Amino acid sequence: MSSYLDDLRIDLAASPASGGSASIAVGSFNIPYEVTRRLKGVGADADTTLTSCASWTQLQKLYEQYGDEPIKKHFEADSERGQRYSVKVSLGSKDENFLFLDYSKSHINDEIKCALLRLAEERGIRQFVQSVFRGERVNTTENRPVLHIALRNRSNRPIYVDGKDVMPAVNKVLDQMRSFSEKVRTGEWKGHTGKAIRHVVNIGIGGSDLGPVMATEALKPFSQRDLSLHFVSNVDGTHIAEVLKSIDIEATLFIVASKTFTTQETITNALSARRALLDYLRSRGIDEKGSVAKHFVALSTNNQKVKEFGIDEENMFQFWDWVGGRYSMWSAIGLPIMISIGYENFVELLTGAHVIDEHFANAPPEQNVPLLLALVGVWYINFFGAVTHAILPYDQYLWRLPAYLQQLDMESNGKYVTRSGKTVSTLTGPIIFGEAGTNGQHAFYQLIHQGTNLIPCDFIGAIQSQNKIGDHHKIFMSNFFAQTEALMIGKSPSEVRRELEAAGERSAEKINALLPHKTFIGGRPSNTLLIKSLTPRALGAIIAMYEHKVLVQGAIWGIDSYDQWGVELGKVLAKSILPQLRPGMRVNNHDSSTNGLINMFNELSHL
């Protein structure tokens, strides 16, 4: 196979050195140099169906024409820009909550928007969405449907998998969750010694942890405060140890969340929790028989393993192979959420997601929030070469949202092979990072404002706070609005000069020395997402919006967004290394680095 570089032609006439914008030809199509220089290792067998689209060629031309145009010029030319490049979706709630997207602070104009919408059409996005909603096996590498939408199908319309309506089974599990969660919340469910449950410990990892953690944190104002929730995910013994120190084990319910009930991290932690319970009872001379069934429930599909663990089958909550881990918070995996906020609020969470499902399936493309969000992202990733995307929630309750969206986006679209089995010919999923509110401003916003990488941002805020304390929320939201504006408009050298002179600086030398440091070039893009208030319904809408954004981007790139083979290799190697971690043992069957690290561990770990 020839090297990818052998197939490239750098247009030196338009290189950065000559003041133009470099491009590289793959076949007959020119891709921006800043994009292709990152695609090392992509060979002649690359999948070029995306880059062969007429709309892709048009977008490349539009990038060359408008890519350097300051965003603020669009606002100067159009006083209604903010209104024209925004969409409001009613969530259908009594409190008149809504989801509002403003994408006007982007390098977008009508021509670019039309070309992006044509790209979605050329890539068959509407047809793909219909395939997903019909229950077709769109997860091709695992031959599975992708039907988390069925879990929040509040219309209760039939949804079929292999000719069978899944809604009766979905509703049955939801009713089972309702009955059990109400027993825990009311104190009817007792531990082995007769104490009511006051602590709930969820043991899971990945999708079995990130979604429940994020949602219970986000919806704390709706929680039952005399129940404390804890989450154990890391196989580092410190995680389970610290949680066990903080609870009354006689009043604790452990939720073991593992579809197969064989996940190494989860089962290791669950066994340690079971050992802690049994050791506690034995140390006090209490008969341990039947105790595990009183203190453990399972979110799993493996009946046999659950029974072997000691959990009553009646307390096993099922879900299905068409529910992917990172899309599972709507399923039985959401049991800790329901225990925390109650059945009615959990249904509100599902309803918010369902509203966006309906919007996504039926709204016209030019008003379709997940579609627009995805297309703006593709524009920046594939034409501006953006490799990171910041999630910036201005609501402390959403502090775990960036971590949740890291898995959702990066595990879904962090791939370099298309559904055809060929390598991609473009960049795919970005690095997702973020932090809540003004904390991020004092950590990494410096790089977003003045760094050398273009980092598109999503600012997420609520108009009404759940905690009305003095002027806190006004101060908070003034920063929210200011940051989106500052990133876009920047600050020119002349503005800096006037500011320094107004502050009393008279030395031209000092002013000239400070000018480059205090200048902001601006043109840093952002989306603004506003809700009226952070309710269960609003949270459901936000999460569903991002799920569908990921779907659209994956479909445009031609990758399978619903498998995660990249998670497996390290796990396999870890299983072979585990028996080698023994005091005094020397290994030499790895590379010299890994051999040395293992040998150092074996030499010192037992001391």
Curated annotation (Swiss-Prot):
Coiled coil: none annotated. Its EC number is 5.3.1.9. GO terms for molecular function: carbohydrate derivative binding; glucose-6-phosphate isomerase activity; monosaccharide binding. Its main location: other. It is an enzyme of class 5 (isomerase). Pathway: Carbohydrate degradation; glycolysis; D-glyceraldehyde 3-phosphate and glycerone phosphate from D-glucose: step 2/4. CDD domains: SIS_PGI_1, SIS_PGI_2. Gene3D superfamilies: 1.10.1390.10, Glucose-6-phosphate isomerase like protein, domain 1 (3.40.50.10490). GO terms for cellular component: cytosol; glycosome. It is found in: Glycosome. One of its GO terms (biological process) is glycolytic process. A motif (Microbody targeting signal) lies at residues 605-607. InterPro entries: G6P_Isomerase (IPR001672), G6P_Isomerase_C (IPR023096), Phosphoglucose_isomerase_CS (IPR018189), SIS_dom_sf (IPR046348), SIS_PGI_1 (IPR035476), SIS_PGI_2 (IPR035482). The keyword Isomerase applies. It catalyses: alpha-D-glucose 6-phosphate = beta-D-fructose 6-phosphate. PROSITE patterns: P_GLUCOSE_ISOMERASE_1 (PS00765), P_GLUCOSE_ISOMERASE_2 (PS00174), P_GLUCOSE_ISOMERASE_3 (PS51463). Homodimer. HAMAP family: G6P_isomerase (MF_00473). This is Glucose-6-phosphate isomerase, glycosomal. The lineage of its organism: Eukaryota, Discoba, Euglenozoa, Kinetoplastea, Metakinetoplastina.
